[in-house]
Amino acid sequence: MKKFIAFFEIPTVDFHRAVDFYETVFGVQLPVFECEEEKMACFTEEVETVGAIFHAPDYIPSEKGVVISFNCEDIDQTLEKVLRKGGKIMMPKTKIEVEGRGWFALFADSEGNRVGLYADK
């Protein structure tokens, strides 16, 4: 069976600001594709694209919609980068009470989307 999640899109107001935000926070390079009014910067995992920062006239960022969560090595360091790039912490690093499950946090990205983080430490 294929992975359960096929693809995700993170809406933007300022596409280039959002790309800079995610590249800096997660230390990745996101290939950019543009087609007329639509723009995408793609998150890749091994050889496949799993999601994108997406800009189109009818896409509106929100902290009230679906939450996409990213794995990271260190939540504290990642949240520091979020703050430096203009994001805000919505829920600080919090222990997941089920034994052995690690930690999570929530932040608002540069566009106002609510995003989650998960880490073992």
Segment roles from a protein language model:
Residues 5, 48-51, 65-67, 102:
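Structural motif
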Residues 39-41, 66, 101-105:
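Short beta-strand micro-motifs in enzyme catalytic cores
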Residues 62-88:
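Mid-chain, well-packed structural core segment of small domains
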Residues 22:
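Catalytic core of tubulin tyrosine ligase-like
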Residues 28-63, 114-119:
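Conserved short beta-strand elements that form part of the metal-binding/catalytic scaffold
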Residues 1-19, 66-68, 120-121:
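N-terminal beta-strand motif that seeds the catalytic metal site of vicinal oxygen chelate
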Residues 3, 10, 31-34, 79-80, ...:
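Vicinal oxygen chelate
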